Amino acid sequence: TNGAVIHTQSRHATETNAPGTVRASGRIPSPGSWIGLKAHIKGLTTSANLEMHRGPIGYLGITQVEDGWHNACGLFRIDRSIKAKQADLLPAYLRKNGNHLLADQLQIADLRDDSFSAVAGFSLGNQPSTPGMMCLGDSHAIIPPFTGNGMTMAFESAEIALPHLIAYAADQFT
């Protein structure tokens, strides 16, 4: 019969040479020089709805989300001399980046318990290819910061690919 098997919430090993295989599962962990850090923080003093704090190894953006909470999200070049763990990584990277006053604010602010995340092991741009497999989204390429409208680009690209994938699954072309 025509159709597809869709695997979600898994790191299912795919057959790379199986006809019609499409990888749209996000980035493939690989050595990289960047670390992304994010947390929701209450108790920051900000002067605008969106603030950008930059330095020699990266940047941090801060924006209000709800009920006095701010989303703090940054991208930094990995520095192996930083020994901090978990939520302490964010102020440690800010200090290394020269953003000492902001790091001091983060140290005394409230951190939403389940909001901290760190992502490392990625490179920007084209990702390693897998022969015999079509890759979409971050599994194909990771756009650089400040490109703008990243999620819009992702949804529009998926919309372009979808009719072709449906036609292939229905044996309308090979």
Question: How would you name each of these model-derived features?
Answer:
Residues 1-26:
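Feature captures the FAD/FMN-dependent oxidoreductase FAD-binding
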Residues 82-161:
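FAD/FMN-dependent oxidoreductases across multiple families
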Residues 10-12, 26, 56, 76, ...:
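Short, well-ordered turn and helix-capping elements at secondary-structure junctions
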Residues 72, 158-161, 165:
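Buried hydrophobic packing segments
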Residues 163-174:
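Active-site-proximal substrate-binding core of FAD-dependent oxidoreductases
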